[in-house]
Amino acid sequence: MTSPLTPADQLIIALDGMERAEALAFISKLPEVSWVKVGLELFVSAGPEVLADLREQGLQIFLDLKFHDIPATIAGACRRAASFGAELITVHACAGRAALAEAQAAACEGAAEVGLSAPRLLAVTVLTSWDQKRLANELCIPQSLQARVEWLAELAAESGLGGCVCSPWEVSGLRRLHPSPFELVTPGIRPSGAELADQVRVMSPAAALNAGASRLVIGRPITRAVDPAEAFARCCLEIEQRQLD
């Protein structure tokens, strides 16, 4: 039987807006953190070497590059990304069934070639900065946002992926359709009192987990806090209290 995840295992700290040295210095002050997210900005500025640096600190990596291209290109990118040791890697669900299936197979091959465990690929559904009105007006998508996310998550599951990325607003409906171990990783997490910034579909850590989220991605409320360690501890406490209720 799988042991329940600890609060630290359920929180992924997004190292967005940081250079390599800043990211490494920041995370070294948070020894309780287990997971970090490396996104496009940090990866483009620092390269794959930053992943090795973070792994040396014992951290697990959510490599959030949101690959979206033709199947062969996505597969090649996922093969290389898996060889860097990331545990979670994102691809856009809109890339389609062939691209998702080939990406999953390539990631397994890339990890095996360097003696690593296969990563879990996550399909990005609809970004948390989008709302229903923009989806219709800018992309001409007539589906409701919930229906769109559920359709893309089903595509990911049918393609053999291990989970998807969605806002916390869609988690409850998705969890009914896709029981664990299908992972639902949710950005748009805002503890009580935190600013929304450019996120639209947001929720508190406890509420998102109660809805069925597997892991939570949280950035600015911790990385820009006056005391990041204390902010992280507060999030963990909120999760612990939820587990006791």
UniProtKB/Swiss-Prot annotation:
Active-site residues (renumbered): K66 (proton donor)
Keyword line: Decarboxylase, Lyase, Pyrimidine biosynthesis
A Pfam family hit: OMPdecase
One GO CC annotation: cytosol
InterPro entries (UniProt xref): Aldolase_TIM (IPR013785), OMPdecase (IPR014732), OMPdecase_AS (IPR018089), OMPdecase_bac (IPR047596), OMPdeCOase_dom (IPR001754), RibuloseP-bd_barrel (IPR011060)
Disulfide bond entries: none
Pathway membership, UniProt: Pyrimidine metabolism; UMP biosynthesis via de novo pathway; UMP from orotate: step 2/2
EC number of this enzyme: 4.1.1.23
Alphabetized SMART domains for the sequence: OMPdecase (SM00934)
Binding residue positions for substrate: 16, 37, 64-73, 128, 190, 199, 219-220
GO molecular function: orotidine-5'-phosphate decarboxylase activity
Catalytic activity: orotidine 5'-phosphate + H(+) = UMP + CO2
Xref: CDD domains: OMP_decarboxylase_like (cd04725)
GO BP annotations, alphabetical order: 'de novo' pyrimidine nucleobase biosynthetic process; 'de novo' UMP biosynthetic process
UniProt-listed PANTHER family: OROTIDINE 5'-PHOSPHATE DECARBOXYLASE
Protein name: Orotidine 5'-phosphate decarboxylase
The organism of origin for this protein: Prochlorococcus marinus (strain MIT 9313)
Encoding gene, per UniProt annotation: pyrF
